[in-house]
């Protein structure tokens, strides 16, 4: 992957604890380092979102989630791999390998391997990221940079320019253990 200077700048900011806004497949997202509690707390405060709800982790390839899959049946891994990269988010058991500020009150965590080039480039530099829609709780997700700036002026550390991926709807969310759809696309 060839990382643009903008993506490299965003990666530096994330490593320093920043909360950024960036384009994804369907809507703008907010993201930060999932291991940085202060950054996640800021992101949740910006969105006015409860920590109990949990957050999605996005990556550039399935290997970035290998630490979670050690005890998974191979058919689970194959099922996820067959849908990635793409607009599929899977709820998987986190086995207490992630902090509560990422998982909320759930026994599962939401994982996605993005097919958006900028998101993949960014994750290739920093690893998995928090990815949540760029909107205050209860408001429509931002579909333009202007809306991101209207919602979050002065609250995010960086807005990574770029185009959305062309999808109409956010990703489908399914439970890996049951196959049940939790959120349709």
Swiss-Prot record:
Enzyme superclass (EC): transferase
GO biological process assignments: regulation of translational fidelity; tRNA threonylcarbamoyladenosine modification
One Pfam family of this chain: Sua5_yciO_yrdC
Catalysis: reaction(s): L-threonine + hydrogencarbonate + ATP = L-threonylcarbamoyladenylate + diphosphate + H2O
Major site of localization recorded for this protein: cytoplasm
Keywords: ATP-binding, Cytoplasm, Nucleotide-binding, Nucleotidyltransferase, Transferase, tRNA processing
One MF term in the entry's GO annotations: ATP binding
Domain YrdC-like per the UniProt entry, residue ranges: 4-185
Family membership: Belongs to the SUA5 family. TsaC subfamily.
Function of the protein: Required for the formation of a threonylcarbamoyl group on adenosine at position 37 (t(6)A37) in tRNAs that read codons beginning with adenine. Catalyzes the conversion of L-threonine, HCO(3)(-)/CO(2) and ATP to give threonylcarbamoyl-AMP (TC-AMP) as the acyladenylate intermediate, with the release of diphosphate.
Record protein name field: Threonylcarbamoyl-AMP synthase
